[in-house]
């Protein structure tokens, strides 16, 4: 089994990139691969707990919690989150808070990296 | 395993989005990556400015005055100061009419490194020799 690291930079609403990243992570984890997710830029928006699932919008909290239960490591860029007014005490439990070198270290140990930035 | 090469491609213009800044800050973070790795392991980032990304390399940004944020110029300078290898596509600065003497230099901060103006073929070589490529 391999190690996959995914870094979606888009927010949940307004783009389907995050939705795709979470579902890809679930598929890889279900197949037994080790999966890491790095959340930075607008991608940090998904860490907020108590998201309301409205049918017109993608929904992340349920998927993120499932991924965490499957052993997927999810880490958010602390500076990016704080800059957007998102604090640790209102985030989904189990998500790590760190900085960009966490991502580089995961890249080092990954067989594949999917970097979904540049928008 | 020991060191691996990572290519950071910056292709977006400055300040239009957060993208260029993120490319640079992710690359700069290589300095402390060993906190999470074993002895002898590490990453070697190479930052390449191509397309409209070369506009990030023009000196004398006024972002603090206009936007109240740290300039991308200061990120470029800090990157040079921490010995990052940074490349600017020669064809693209020529295409946009940017003279080489308008590019950022961190000599005033004591940096040994300089932005390296190289043909695109050299950037392709960097891509070919990198384990992973990140496009910003």
Model-derived segments and spans:
Chain B
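Histidine-anchored nucleotide/phosphate-binding helix
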Residues: 20-42, 47
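Low-complexity intrinsically disordered segments
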Residues: 93-94, 108-131
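A glycine-rich helix N-cap at a beta->alpha junction
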Residues: 63-93
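Extreme N-terminal starter segment of soluble prokaryotic enzymes
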Residues: 2-7
């Amino acid at each position: 089994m391999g190690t996959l690291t995914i870094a979606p930079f888009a927010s949940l609403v307004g783009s389907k990139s995050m939705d795709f990243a979470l579902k890809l992570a679930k598929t890889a984890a279900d197949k037994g691969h080790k999966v890491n997710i790095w959340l930075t830029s607008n991608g940090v928006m998904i860490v907020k707990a108590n998201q309301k699932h409205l049918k017109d919008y993608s929904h992340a909290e349920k998927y993120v919690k499932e991924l965490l239960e499957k052993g997927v490591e999810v880490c958010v860029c602390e500076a990016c989150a704080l800059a957007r007014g998102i604090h640790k005490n209102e985030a989904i439990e189990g998500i790590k808070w760190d900085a960009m070198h966490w991502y580089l270290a995961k890249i080092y140990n990954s067989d594949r990296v999917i970097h979904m930035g540049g928008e | 395993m020991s060191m691996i090469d990572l290519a950071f491609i910056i292709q977006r213009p400055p300040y239009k989005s957060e993208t260029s800044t993120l490319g640079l800050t992710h690359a700069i973070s290589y300095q402390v990556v060993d906190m999470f790795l074993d002895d002898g392991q590490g990453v070697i980032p190479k930052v390449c400015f191509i397309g409209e990304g070369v506009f990030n390399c023009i000196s004398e940004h006024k972002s603090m005055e206009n936007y109240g944020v740290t300039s991308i110029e200061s990120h470029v300078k800090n990157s040079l100061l921490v010995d990052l290898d940074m490349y600017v596509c020669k064809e693209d600065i020529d295409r946009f009419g940017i003279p080489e003497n308008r590019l950022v230099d961190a000599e005033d901060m004591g940096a040994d490194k300089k932005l390296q103006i190289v043909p695109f073929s050299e950037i392709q070589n960097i891509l070919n020799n990198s384990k992973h490529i990140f496009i910003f």
